[in-house]
Amino acid sequence: MYKRQLEYPEIREYLDEHIEKDWVDLVYAGKTIVQRGKEANDQINILGDDGVPVEYHERFWKSELIDFVILQQDAFDDIDANCPMERQQMMYKMVLGICNQEFAFADFEACSQFFKGLINLFRQMNYSEWKSEKFEGYRKQIEQYVSEQSK
């Protein structure tokens, strides 16, 4: 889909009806997180890891979470390559929910470690059959992992 197509009322109506009401708003929310993450990364590259507040690192890693979990798929894995829309919706909303939370990190290294661990859990979840025990196990692990770090 071209980036401006989401602005067309007909596209919005179609997505509201066939995917979920206000789906376009959720897409824009994710897009904004990714854009803010790129901006934060630019500042980190200019000023250095210690030259910016931890919040910049958090913003960057939230965008990486969307990138690694939602935007990238493993075409060589049958499960990840063939992801039903219901699963995509659930995963996207789960990732957005995490991105909308506030966390308390001691420093940028703690932030980086947390998000790398989270991305790894989501990747394992992506390789698990939809609604299987393994899938649900990873979902619970992710929820626990996030709740331990939340403010």
Label each region the model flagged.
Residues 3-151:
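Conserved catalytic/coupling modules of large nucleotide/cofactor-utilizing molecular machines
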